[in-house]
């Protein structure tokens, strides 16, 4: 036995040294990749699980997979939300006959039924958590096996989040969109927490009861199960290995496991001078646990762990390893262009890298549990995570919805409790109205699942004050609506310290320019930056709690990291600091400048940065002439135009304008007056202690001359597994390589070698050919199963072609489940495609608005007049001048007019408004049109279909704040 352990350790060390994921053949556990060789059918199939079904016309696909590729800008509930079937053939050798065989699904959206050889194995509800299908006693050992999965993306109010997609601010999308693996173990094994139903148990749970800089104790609770009819005399052997491959702690515990029984084995590992995990020093250890029987390894698991301790205080915020850390975070949606949520693990990693380079030390996984690969990357690169139960502006009192929510909450904690990056668990249904009993139950089950002082739950205070006992950390800690009714007022006396304070979302919905597309000008991008830096400095929406200006603020999360499509509106949500393709806007660099210049992570980023927020393209914009903004986290910035010094500014000089930001460790903006515009080159130098530590130059773009193909690697070598994805940008540039930022050029793409262009030849989704946006195009290339070179070429009329190459590496260190015997799958991606017709709402919005003669209200807050209701601007508001309800708003037309529809946009997107709408032809006799309660996000047109001279809106109740409107439009 000792010799075997030494051999295993040596092999583990070799694997760690060369960055490989190794499989020890005698470990008793085999994990087989199942991401390739699937057949897919879009639509429902009678008895689609039959082994003798003719599936030759089905579409050959690889996972991750969305049931229908979509346009990049696919808002307005235009995506596929129906049924789909998947089939995977395989044959297993007889050596596995006495083994436990399960298939692990990381994510299937939304509900699914799993079959093997025509027999139902299990069903699962909810697309954001994985599950296990046990095939142990169902395998056909004499021939082919057919694993079939019926997936439903149809609306389901009983499965959280539950809200229909046409009312959602994001999309669920569809399909088997995360990894699938077959796991083969002995029938005496270490369990999977998602298969077991044990509070704070199943699998392995690692906690750290003692953590100091001098020593730490890791407590292991390993759950083992015996499926045999024989008692087993065993031992559990655990080793902790550092990054250099040295075993620094180990423990062996004997255990007797009776037949058909299970047990949790507890062990302690002691570490001297531990390398603690921290966002800026994300030290990880390898924990390997073996289940031993005499000289045989029955099972083995290996995981990365990080030793750290956290605490939150109401007065000072967040502490990690005893040191205070201010969280600067972003909200991230997991969706990508064309493929929705179905992106490979490498794309999850790239998002983490991009967030870290963008100056963030934290991310809010809004509004659902993210991909395991994303969390593993957060552990590896050092990104704190707020993990959320799935929910958004919806609560269903049905007991099925509630029980599924509880189960998802339990499973989320069991899956992710060992991640050092996860430091806050958002157990509130985001922006929803729900009973105190629900908050109490989720709070109690969360602390039961993660006992001790390292579990912190989070929710909103304002609007939920009665739930104070059931959250450990609060967002929105304000005592009341602003006393003057101005939602952009910030009165320090209104801010309270009930619990530790964070702001979950800021930066969208209010301000000079909260949303901007890369198709817009540099000046529009700068408007977004100016808006957000003012908000950071304390001049934001009242329930953002003044952000950096609040002395009790522990951190905040900008909305949002990335642009994304949503069901509630046709237009893409342009709130991101990067677009859907992850191409950065100016605001990416503004927030990057908030990071500490003294903190660098080797191989990831260097601390000092400088960025000129200008295309230097036109004298029409102040951002190229009199207000050239430079973002930097350094002490001093010099700006040159054509080698002539425009000026020098210091951090100290700029601090008075941005004092709150600077006091929280952030940076001011540096704004230079360059006078008259000149073509040429702007160059910025950033200095620390008088030395230049970073530079950035921007040259005036000339005439479009060429295409540049930019394969975004981020140091990641793509894997030839038939499943990996590579992001590629296509830039329209002048002869010197400067981006033509306003180009909408049509380009064509050719991929050759060992890669495939995702969505090639599908004109419906506009990938090839495609029109670039803001001078930049984008596409995914998927790898084949053969390692080799991939060449990506782009052409456009009148421009020199661009070309780039990348090589893939073999799929080593892991095994794939071999394909079974079946007919050739001949289906095409567009078979049975579902193109939703232009919605009635969209057609209505394309009509001209009717002129409204006048509007009357009961009261108005200063600065928010009634005229804002009918000024054709959604971003100007009417707010009632008093808290009294109801508030009545009456519109009058010049004469009785046929009105097809009305569109009512309420002032606050997260508040719920109970209201009724009536119409009249004479102002005396009123006819009820409808009564409803909705949030500010639900602003699609409603049918009127009658003659109207007067329309009366009565706002009867508001969940948070006063009655308010953005706009009322009639069509």
Where are these regions (language model features)?
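Accessory carbohydrate-binding/adhesion or oligomerization-edge regions at the termini
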Residues: 20-71, 150, 154-159, 175-177, ...
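Trp- and acidic/polar-enriched beta-sheet ligand-binding modules for extracellular glycan
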Residues: 882-885, 908-971
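Extended carbohydrate-recognition surfaces in non-catalytic/accessory domains of CAZymes
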Residues: 23-106, 160-167, 173-176, 186-188, ...
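Disordered, acidic Ser/Thr/Pro-rich linker "stalks" and the adjacent N-terminal cap
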Residues: 27, 55-63, 116, 827-895, ...
């Amino acid at each position: 036995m000792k010799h075997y352990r030494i051999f295993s350790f040596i092999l583990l060390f070799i694997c760690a040294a060369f960055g490989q994921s190794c499989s020890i053949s005698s470990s008793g556990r085999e994990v087989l990749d199942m991401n390739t060789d699937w057949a897919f059918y879009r639509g429902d199939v009678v008895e689609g699980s039959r082994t003798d079904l003719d599936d030759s016309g089905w579409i050959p696909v690889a996972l991750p997979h969305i049931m229908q590729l979509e346009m990049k800008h696919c808002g307005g509930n235009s995506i596929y939300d129906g049924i789909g079937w998947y089939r995977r053939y395989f044959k297993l050798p007889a050596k596995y006959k006495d083994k436990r065989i399960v298939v692990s699904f990381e994510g299937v959206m939304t509900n699914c039924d799993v079959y093997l050889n025509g027999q139902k194995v299990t069903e699962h509800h909810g697309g954001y958590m994985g599950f296990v299908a046990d095939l142990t006693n169902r395998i056909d050992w004499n021939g082919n096996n057919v694993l079939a999965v019926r997936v439903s993306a149809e609306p389901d109010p009983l499965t959280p989040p539950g809200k229909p997609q046409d009312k959602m601010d994001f999309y669920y999308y569809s399909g088997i969109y995360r990894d699938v693996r077959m796991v083969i173990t002995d029938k005496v094994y270490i369990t999977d927490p998602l298969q077991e139903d044990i509070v704070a148990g199943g699998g392995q749970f690692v906690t750290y009861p003692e953590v100091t800089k001098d020593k730490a104790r890791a407590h292991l609770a390993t759950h083992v199960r015996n499926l045999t009819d024989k008692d087993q005399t065993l031992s559990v052997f655990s080793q902790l290995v550092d990054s250099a491959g040295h075993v620094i702690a180990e423990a062996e515990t004997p255990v007797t496991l009776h037949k058909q029984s299970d047990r949790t084995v507890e062990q302690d590992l002691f570490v001297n001078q531990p390398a603690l995990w921290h966002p800026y020093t994300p030290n990880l250890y390898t924990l390997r646990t073996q289940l031993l029987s005499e000289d045989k390894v029955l099972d083995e698991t290996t995981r990365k762990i990080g030793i750290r301790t956290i605490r939150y205080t109401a007065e000072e915020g967040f502490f990690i390893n005893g040191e205070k850390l201010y969280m600067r975070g972003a909200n991230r949606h997991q969706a990508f262009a064309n493929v929705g949520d179905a992106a490979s693990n490498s794309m999850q990693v790239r998002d983490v890298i991009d967030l870290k380079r963008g100056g963030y030390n934290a991310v809010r996984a809004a509004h659902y549990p993210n991909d395991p690969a994303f969390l593993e990357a957060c552990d590896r690169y050092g990104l704190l995570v707020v993990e959320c139960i799935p929910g958004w502006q919806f609560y269903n009192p049905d007991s099925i919805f509630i029980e599924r929510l509880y189960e998802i909450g339990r499973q989320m904690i069991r899956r992710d409790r060992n991640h050092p990056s996860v430091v806050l668990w958002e157990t509130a249904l985001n922006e929803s109205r729900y009973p105190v009993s629900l908050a109490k139950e989720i709070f109690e089950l969360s602390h039961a699942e993660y006992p001790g002082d390292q579990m912190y739950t989070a929710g909103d205070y304002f609007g939920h004050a009665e739930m104070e006992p059931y959250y450990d950390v609060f967002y929105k800690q304000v005592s009341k609506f602003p006393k003057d009714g101005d939602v952009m007022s910030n009165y320090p006396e209104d801010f309270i310290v009930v619990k530790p304070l964070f702001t979950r979302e800021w930066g969208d919905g209010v301000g000079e320019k909260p949303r901007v597309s890369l198709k817009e000008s540099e000046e529009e991008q700068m408007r977004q930056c100016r808006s957000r830096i003012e908000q950071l400095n304390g001049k934001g929406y009242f329930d953002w709690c003044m952000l950096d200006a609040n002395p009790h603020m522990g951190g905040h999360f900008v909305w949002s990291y990335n642009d994304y499509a949503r069901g509630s509106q046709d237009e893409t949500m342009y709130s991101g600091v990067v677009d859907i393709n992850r191409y950065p806007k100016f605001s990416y660099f503004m927030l990057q400048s908030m990071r500490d210049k003294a903190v660098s992570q080797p191989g990831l980023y260097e601390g000092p940065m400088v960025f000129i927020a200008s295309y230097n393209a036109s004298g029409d914009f102040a951002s190229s002439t009199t207000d050239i903004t430079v973002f930097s986290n350094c002490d001093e910035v010099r700006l040159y135009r054509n080698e002539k010094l425009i000026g020098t500014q210091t951090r100290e000089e700029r601090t008075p304008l941005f004092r709150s930001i600077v006091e929280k460790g952030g940076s001011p903006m540096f704004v230079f007056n360059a006078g008259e515009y000149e073509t040429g080159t702007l160059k910025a130098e950033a200095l620390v202690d008088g030395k230049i530590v970073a530079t950035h130059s921007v040259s005036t773009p000339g005439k479009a001359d060429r295409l540049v193909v930019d394969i975004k690697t981020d140091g990641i070598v793509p894997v030839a597994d038939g499943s990996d994805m590579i992001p590629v940008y296509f830039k329209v540039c002048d002869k010197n390589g400067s981006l033509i930022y306003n180009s909408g050029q049509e380009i064509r793409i050719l991929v050759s070698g060992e890669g495939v262009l995702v969505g090639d030849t599908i004109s419906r989704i506009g990938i090839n050919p495609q029109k670039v946006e803001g001078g930049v195009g984008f596409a995914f290339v998927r790898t084949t199963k053969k390692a080799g070179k991939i060449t990506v070429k782009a052409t456009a009329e009148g421009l020199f072609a661009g070309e780039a190459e990348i090589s893939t590496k073999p799929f080593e260190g892991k095994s794939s489940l071999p394909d079974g015997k079946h007919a050739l799958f001949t289906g095409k991606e567009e078979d049975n495609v579902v193109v939703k017709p232009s919605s009635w709402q969209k057609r209505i919005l394309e009509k001209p608005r009717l002129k409204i003669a006048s509007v009357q209200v009961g009261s108005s807050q200063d600065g928010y007049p009634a005229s804002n209701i009918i000024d054709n601007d959604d971003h100007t508001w009417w707010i009632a001048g008093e808290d009294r309800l109801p508030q009545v708003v009456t519109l009058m037309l010049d004469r009785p007019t046929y009105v097809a529809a009305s569109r009512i946009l309420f002032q606050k997107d997260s508040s719920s408004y109970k209201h009724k709408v009536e119409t009249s032809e004479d102002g005396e006799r009123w006819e009820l049109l409808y009564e409803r309660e909705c949030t500010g996000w639900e602003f699609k047109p409603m049918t009127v279909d009658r003659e109207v001279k007067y329309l009366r809106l009565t706002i009867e109740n508001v969940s948070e704040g006063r009655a308010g409107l953005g706009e009322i439009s009639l069509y």
